[in-house]
Design a protein with these regions (language model features):
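Cell-envelope/extracellular polymer assembly enzymes that use nucleotide-activated donors
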Residues: 6-8, 35
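Short, well-formed alpha-helical segments that are part of the catalytic scaffolds
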Residues: 15-29
Length: 123
């Protein structure tokens, strides 16, 4: 919950078996996320086992492709605020706070996980 509004995090997954659990656990400990949705887009074997060890809800999207996975996650999400994050370690859960800080003032807030300032990723 962020300022009285629910927060859903959507994580499309394909080859993130090794990082998915740590990513989900970091969102769980953040304390503001009401719903974690993992969109299994033909993910590597064992990914579902890692997801099952968390509070996340896993949904399957059989049509291959990032766009299909994102759309499926958006359809499934029930939060007032929706965050799309990559579960490969390039998006840190704490960066969601930086995005949500602007949510009251704008209809859409974007962050880049690839922007580099001082050699490090910043949102």
């Amino acid at each position: 919950m962020w300022q009285g509004k629910s927060v859903s995090v959507i994580l499309p997954t394909y080859n993130e078996k090794e990082s998915i659990r740590a990513s989900l656990e970091s969102f769980e400990t953040l304390g503001i996320v009401d719903e974690l949705i993992v969109v299994n887009n033909n993910a590597a074997p064992g990914t579902s086992d890692e997801v099952a060890r968390t509070s996340a809800r896993e949904v399957e999207e059989t049509r291959q492709g990032y766009g299909f996975a994102i759309r499926r996650g958006l359809d499934e999400a029930r939060g007032d605020y929706l965050i799309i994050a990559e579960p490969d370690g390039t998006f840190l859960a704490r960066d969601a706070l930086k995005l949500l800080a602007y949510a009251d003032d704008f209809d859409v807030v974007y962050g880049s996980r690839t922007a580099r300032i001082d050699g490090r990723a910043h949102v």
